[in-house]
Design a protein with these regions (language model features):
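Mid-to-C-terminal functional-domain signal that highlights helix-capping/loop sites
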Residues: 22-297
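Bacterial N-terminal signal peptides that target proteins for export
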Residues: 1-8
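Bacterial N-terminal signal peptides
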Residues: 8-18
């Protein structure tokens, strides 16, 4: 019997798919730029270990944890969440060991990372507003539970996280450590979906929803990136050649098993509803479901 492929479903901008083909080998001598040095003063990162060129790391503006992760998340029930979430508001949804939780993008857009424990499993929920990628990871790795924060750096316009235990840098889109003591290590991805709040309610009537009581003063009903995902825009701080097969800001569903990587335009999924395809030699089906609007608008 063929072992099923491990699939990752993430709604992302098309340009970010170039990451999966990036050379992950050390580039040899590649000194930190003056800008990068200034952005990382006081860090205890082991800069002698890296699998990328340092010139690929760019400051997104805010300092480390200037976009604050949520470390002590509070949750409410579906009925309480109805007071401020519309039925089609997008949430990152997952279920582990019978524990179902939803993380509204209205909150994640402002924080990007939530360190949580779901079904007794330490996890981190991540969202990159620049590439619209929503990915969950198991954060207990080789006997250590890691806490993640925002580094303030970007690579290929994607969130670069750091762990507080070793201060290594991790690429959000792949879950791979790219700089520091953990370079080359890979976090385990956890199946999570980007769905509408009403869909979460229907599937998990007793599920929990991340509360707006985050400990930070943010206007969660306001989108801090209005118009960013206009199809005619260019990705922020993306300096590599853009794949011309689709507009750079086109939304796609990506599926990966670690070796093979497919991208499906959302417009195509909305048109056909179901697409039968293969990931490598593994047959697969991709479904489109209505009921969730896009966060940006």
């Amino acid at each position: 019997m063929t072992k099923p492929a491990v699939l990752l479903f993430a709604l992302v901008m098309f340009f970010i798919t170039n990451l999966v083909s990036a050379n992950s080998q050390s580039k040899g001598e590649d000194k930190l730029s003056d800008l990068l040095r200034r952005a990382t003063i006081g860090w205890n990162t082991d800069w002698s270990k890296h699998s990328i060129e340092y010139r690929e790391l760019l400051s997104g503006g805010p300092p480390r944890d200037g976009i604050p992760p949520i470390d002590q998340p509070k949750f409410i029930d579906n009925q309480q969440a109805e007071q401020w979430l519309a039925p089609n508001d997008p949430v990152i949804a997952l279920e582990l060991n019978g524990d179902a939780r939803a993380y509204p993008l209205q909150i994640l857009t402002w924080h990007e990372i939530v360190n949580d424990t779901v079904g007794e499993i330490p996890i981190t929920i991540t969202f990159c507003p620049l590439c619209n990628s929503a990915i969950a990871f198991e954060r207990h790795y080789q006997g250590t539970t890691y806490d993640f924060g925002t580094s303030g750096l970007l690579r290929h316009s994607d969130l670069v996280m750091y762990d507080r235990q070793t201060e290594s840098l991790w690429q959000q889109f792949t879950g791979e450590a790219i700089v520091g003591a953990m370079t080359g290590e890979q976090l385990k991805m956890i199946p999570a979906g980007l769905i509408g709040f009403e869909q979460f309610q229907s599937a998990y009537p007793t599920g929990k929803v991340l509360s707006k009581e985050t400990g930070y003063s943010r206007d969660y009903v306001r989108n801090p990136y209005p118009g960013y995902d206009d199809i005619h825009n260019n990705p922020f701080l993306f300096r590599d050649p853009v794949d011309k097969r689709l507009p750079a800001m086109a939304r796609v569903v990506t599926i990966s098993d670690g070796e093979y990587h497919n991208a499906y335009p959302v417009t195509l999924l909305e048109k056909f509803g179901v697409i039968h395809h293969q990931l490598g030699n593994q047959p697969m089906v991709v479904f489109s479901s209505s009921g969730s609007q896009q966060r940006f608008g």
